[in-house]
Amino acid sequence: MIQHDQRTAVWRRLGTNVIGLTPAEALAKAGADYEVGIVPLVASVPDTLVSAVAGQEMSVAKRVPRKNLTYRLDNGEPIAPVGARYHVVQTKEVLSLVEAMTGAGWQPEFAGTFNNNSAVFMAGKMDMALKTREIDPYLCFVNSFDGSTGVKFACTPFRPFCTNQIRAIFTKRGERPVISLRHTTHILKRADTARELLGLTTAYYRYMDEQVERLLDKVLTEQMLSQALDIVAPIKQDAPDFVRERKEQKRAMLVHTLRTSPTIEDRDRDSAWGLYNAMTELEQWNRDQFPTQAQAEKMFGNHLGMVPMTNPSDRMLRVLTAPYFG
């Protein structure tokens, strides 16, 4: 397992330190202030008739129906194919929204690009105090150019004690509050977006803080621990021996992490919050080497998305917060 003093938050890994800079300065320093163009997508396809006459493989350029291509205007590098109705929103066009959030207490700390320059991001902490002090209230701004999402602000809770990014945590519908604006010509007409975003972010972190406090207060009995283990690492009676052994190892490793990890306070080892953090720690850091660039980008994308709770830590959370648990 990667030791806690060697861990790095994913936005620090992918981005550039921009603390103290304005949003425009942050984008420039991170090399994320480029503009994006869009052109019809053309493919080079084999021309069988000409190839037969020429005696070698020849190709012809053909327009791909209902598809365009985004590309960087500064260097001409292609980014991604998109639909014919896709509208590019330049990052500089939404800077007023970003600046409105900085005026409300959000300060970008890291900025950069990921997924082959198909998205730019800024990540920073909201200026708000949480009672439990277990989570730092981070917010990420993202603008993509590959059609995967629009302009997005996503709550990305971060636990500094173990450098864990907490995904899909403590929500009523299994999603984190995310304002995502599709790339259309109407995107810049939403004057109330900053106010809506601030309200959702504040409400989300207040609600999350309450749930953390409940988990801290929930004493973890042996019966509750066994029940949680049966959810995240169930062992069927008719399972082959090698499957049972693998599951038993996973369960034992989780309990060992709960009892010994230096990132979990001794007072929390018998709490539901301690068990949840042991699960997230194993999920993110139980590896022999740091994630590759591609793995880090995938991890970051998962934390930014509005996705159902499917990871073991997500299933663990559902168990720990269920009314019947305990």
Locations of regions flagged by a protein language model:
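Intrinsically disordered, low-complexity regions enriched in serine/threonine
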Residues: 1-52, 128-326
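N-terminal low-complexity, intrinsically disordered segments
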Residues: 1-114
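Ser/Thr-rich, low-complexity intrinsically disordered terminal regions
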Residues: 103-134, 233
